[in-house]
Amino acid sequence: MFLVVGQGNPGERYARTRHNLGFMVLDRLGLSFRPRGEALVAEAEGGLFLKPLTYYNLTGRAVAPLARFYKIPPERILVVHDEMDLPLGRIRFKAGGSAAGNRGVLSIEEALGTRAFHRLRLGIGKPPDPSRGAEYVLSPFREEELPVVERVLEAAKEAVWCWVREGLPPCAGRFNGLDLSLG
């Protein structure tokens, strides 16, 4: 059993924002999601896929109860989320480590009581004005960024299936060096 969590905010208002890349990746998987608790959940490949309805910064409220109920260990949880510390076009697997200011990841860490879960970090780059980070992550991608976003979503979809079927080490080796910003 495993759990893949796509980070994002519910509602049409946020659907195409940088903060919703995790939701966008899960949408690409072609699964049927149904409401369960504070999330939309799909089942496939012997595991669960979760789109929390709690809003980004409270994701742990949806993740922890499901992980506990199904007795899913942290190393079988993958959180797919946007990452300002990576440029747009880069994706990177990571096991554990600091939330680096990502409040959604911190919420999961606090709710699970551990940092040992895996992450698929999707680069969105830094805002032009560092003091406007919240506004930046809640903004839609610019038109000229959309081709790169499309490549990121396709690669991230493949990366999620890789993690599900093969685990972290081979997938990190395959995806961590990719530069999808180049056409």
From Swiss-Prot:
It is an enzyme of class 3 (hydrolase). The record marks 82 as: Stabilizes the basic form of H active site to accept a proton. It catalyses: an N-acyl-L-alpha-aminoacyl-tRNA + H2O = an N-acyl-L-amino acid + a tRNA + H(+). It holds the Pfam family Pept_tRNA_hydro. TRNA binds at residues 14, 55, 57. It is found in: Cytoplasm. The keyword Hydrolase applies. Keywords: Cytoplasm, Hydrolase, RNA-binding, tRNA-binding. GO terms for molecular function: peptidyl-tRNA hydrolase activity; tRNA binding. Its main location: cytoplasm. The active site is at 19 (proton acceptor). One of its GO terms (cellular component) is cytoplasm. Its EC number is 3.1.1.29. GO terms for biological process: protein quality control for misfolded or incompletely synthesized proteins; rescue of stalled ribosome. The record marks 9 as: Discriminates between blocked and unblocked aminoacyl-tRNA. PROSITE patterns: PEPT_TRNA_HYDROL_1. Belongs to the PTH family. Hydrolyzes ribosome-free peptidyl-tRNAs (with 1 or more amino acids incorporated), which drop off the ribosome during protein synthesis, or as a result of ribosome stalling. Catalyzes the release of premature peptidyl moieties from peptidyl-tRNA molecules trapped in stalled 50S ribosomal subunits, and thus maintains levels of free tRNAs and 50S ribosomes. Monomer. This is Peptidyl-tRNA hydrolase. It comes from Thermus thermophilus (strain ATCC 27634 / DSM 579 / HB8).
